[in-house]
């Protein structure tokens, strides 16, 4: 089946392309209809697509490298979940190795004796593309169980995170993760969600599943045609806030949870004004930077997370995505550009769904329709960002030859990965670790892909990296002082430069995203108007928590639905940040 995809009204300024090829390339891969089976049928169009030999040559740099860095960070996927099957023993680049799942699958066994192996998701396409459903546990105690198979004290097994107690499932010796507890932790998580009812084997097994390359053609094409990192770990074995904080501040100020131990207010405390970010370092050095977020979201996640040091730049250095696409087209990218996916309404951040367990659990009416928490929406966003950079041809400013695009994820989100996280350098910022964590070990592997004109197709970077590599690279480029001991000792990204001469635009692949069904959240004028009771994802709840912690009124309830988020954003956030 093939059909032409019409861009969503919420593409937020993504250019329609000089030749319209960018969106006309978005045809449906064979078998992506509502009833199609996943595994071999869907997403079959992984092919690179046509090359554009007719494009004029762009000037090379005086030496291999890049002048502009663009980073986009998605949500809550492990390396094995997204890229674990990128290469098998029969299709590796010559002389290369790859730390993936093939040819040997892995297993986990639950305390109840259920054994589940790693597998490719199967089933109806629209269901498959939002797995795992529901969202696994991602907080520090959950991750301890996932990595070590421990539950300590035993009573933590039946508790929510807020009720768990020390040592928060951490073993006495945390030096050798076994990666054996993902299934057991998910079983416990489902049991709590189902109020004590035992989950079925079918419900539990999704935690060990993942996508084939054919299912995620954009990620797979870019990973194969440029560089993939098979040893990139997130900064903290926990959830969103602390990992996104480490990306730009090289610390999470001792926090390992979004809201435990002080609420969302802890991220906005006055004493964090002495903890600068790499944005502050760039500003002090006279370099340019900008954070781009989706207009539908109204406020920037990054801006709020680092409000004590970035609020003064909200009007001047934060813009919506239409400005990003214009900056790319006009050759006006800053030295560093950070992109936020849409995290609240109609989200394209690739975060797994949250809410009820089954799509037909409420009065027999589907709770999740196609493209809700759908990884294809994230694929489309990456396709739009990459395609814009691929077509950037300024001869005097930023262009495809002098720009590095990095795509990665904040954390593994509780999804299985088989590689034990290594030890880490603590930030050394003098802040006591929440839940007794010493910040001396990294979190799980996450997908990470680099796109550069100076990167040979089939590049696999085996160096052990983590989120601190972004700060370390920017510091090396612009002579910045380290923020903490973590980024001071971090490796950089220059290992992706494997060519002496740049690949011209005509040698870059044309990515072909899968057909993305219309999202019922995207119409009419605003998702909140027809999806009032839809539950917010954890990142969206966190953003609402920060918004109310800063601007909310005493006693104001934390929004947990689309309608609540819409009202809160309209009331408190409408004029806080710069626009296009």
What are these regions (language model features)?
Residues 2-7, 16-18, 25-580:
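N-terminal pro-sequences and low-complexity stem/linker regions of secreted or lumenal proteins
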């Amino acid at each position: 089946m093939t059909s032409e995809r019409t861009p969503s009204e919420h593409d937020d300024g993504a250019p329609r392309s000089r030749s319209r090829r960018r969106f006309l390339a978005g045809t449906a891969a064979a078998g992506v209809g509502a009833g199609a089976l996943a595994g071999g049928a869907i997403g079959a169009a992984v092919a690179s697509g046509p090359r554009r030999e007719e494009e004029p040559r762009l000037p090379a740099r005086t030496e291999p490298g890049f002048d502009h860095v663009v980073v986009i960070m998605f949500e809550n996927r492990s390396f094995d979940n997204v890229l674990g099957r990128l290469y098998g023993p029969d299709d590796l680049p010559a002389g290369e190795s790859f730390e993936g799942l093939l040819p040997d699958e892995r297993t986990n066994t639950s305390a109840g004796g259920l054994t589940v192996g790693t597998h490719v998701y199967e089933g109806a396409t629209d269901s498959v593309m939002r797995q795992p459903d529901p969202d696994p546990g991602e907080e520090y105690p959950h991750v301890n169980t996932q990595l070590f198979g421990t539950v300590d004290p035993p009573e933590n097994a039946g508790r929510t995170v807020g009720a768990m107690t020390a040592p928060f499932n951490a073993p006495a010796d945390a030096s050798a993760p076994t990666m054996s507890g993902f299934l057991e932790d998910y079983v416990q998580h489902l049991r709590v969600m189902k109020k004590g009812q035992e989950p079925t084997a079918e419900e539990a097994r999704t935690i060990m599943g993942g996508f084939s390359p054919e299912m995620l053609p954009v990620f797979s094409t870019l990973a194969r045609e440029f560089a993939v990192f098979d040893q990139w770990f997130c900064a903290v074995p926990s959830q969103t806030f602390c990992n996104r904080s480490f990306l730009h501040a090289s610390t999470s100020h001792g926090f390992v949870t979004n809201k435990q131990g002080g609420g969302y207010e802890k991220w906005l405390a006055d004493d964090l004004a002495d903890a600068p970010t790499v944005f502050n370092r760039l500003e002090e050095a006279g370099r340019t930077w900008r954070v781009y977020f989706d207009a539908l979201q109204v406020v920037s996640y990054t801006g709020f997370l680092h409000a004590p040091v970035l609020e003064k730049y909200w009007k001047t250095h934060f813009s919506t995505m239409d400005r990003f696409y214009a900056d790319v087209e006009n050759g006006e990218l800053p030295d560093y550009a950070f992109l936020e996916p849409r995290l609240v309404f109609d989200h394209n951040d690739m975060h797994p769904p949250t809410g009820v367990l089954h799509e037909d659990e409420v009065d027999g009416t589907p709770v999740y329709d196609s493209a809700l928490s759908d990884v294809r929406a994230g694929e489309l966003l990456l396709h739009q960002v990459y395609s814009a950079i691929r077509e950037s041809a300024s001869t005097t400013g930023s262009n495809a030859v002098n720009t590095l695009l990095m795509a990665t994820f904040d954390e593994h989100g509780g999804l299985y990965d088989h590689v034990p996280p290594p030890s880490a350098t603590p930030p050394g910022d003098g802040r006591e670790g929440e839940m007794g964590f010493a910040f001396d070990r990294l979190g799980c592997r996450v997908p990470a892909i680099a796109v550069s004109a100076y990167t040979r197709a089939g590049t696999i970077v085996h160096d052990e990296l983590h989120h601190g590599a972004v700060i370390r690279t920017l510091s090396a480029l612009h002579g910045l002082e380290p923020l903490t001991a973590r980024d001071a000792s971090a490796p950089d990204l220059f290992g992706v430069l494997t060519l002496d001469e740049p690949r011209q635009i005509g040698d870059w692949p044309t990515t072909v995203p899968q057909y993305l069904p219309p999202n019922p959240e995207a119409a009419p004028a605003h998702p909140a108007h027809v999806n009032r009771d839809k539950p917010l994802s954890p990142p969206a709840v966190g953003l609402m928590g920060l918004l109310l912690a800063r601007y909310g009124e005493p006693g104001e309830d934390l929004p947990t639905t689309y309608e609540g988020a819409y009202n809160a954003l309209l009331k408190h956030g409408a004029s806080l940040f710069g626009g296009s």
